[in-house]
Amino acid sequence: MKVSLSAAILVGCVALSGCMSGTMGRAKDAAPPTTVASVDLNKYAGKWYEIARYPNSFQKKCEGVTAEYALRPDGRVGVTNTCATGTSDGKARSAQGVAAVIDGSNNTKLAVNFAPIPLPKGQGNYWVLYLDPNYQTALVGSPNGSYLWLLARTKSISVDQRAALNSAAERNGFRTDLLKDTIQP
């Protein structure tokens, strides 16, 4: 498969996101975010729609964003992130990655890599901060506060579901006023 320069830059930025310091949406002196107690990866696997996110360089002009997770025989999780560029009916592009569960995290912290640039051993950039009991909505963020995503199994969510996600974000020190809603076709 041929990879364009822009796609290579995209996956490189995603891979480095967990290594970069920054606190876009959290106070520098805030305690680390708190993850959920555990995640059943069998239930978590499948397609998720991005409801909102912190703006970031590797998702500029992305709409119609989805993330698909698939369990692999080696115990890791395959990740396919897809977005359309420009508008919700723009040309789709995808990035393929692999996630490894951080030991001792009960599947709540993962190190996700989208390029041959690995994260430092034991460092997770994908923390599950909220997950409703039915695995229909999730809040995922980076421990340094630079990234935050609201995810759902459907293209839209209820006002109550959004309030629960926002509340979980705020409890973890994330600013919800910085969230950008994602257009889903």
Regions found by a protein language model. Name each.
Residues 3, 19-185:
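A beta-rich soluble binding module of mature secreted/lumenal proteins
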Residues 13-16:
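Bacterial Sec-type N-terminal signal peptides, specifically the leucine/valine-rich hydrophobic h-region
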Residues 1-8:
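Bacterial N-terminal signal peptides that target proteins for export
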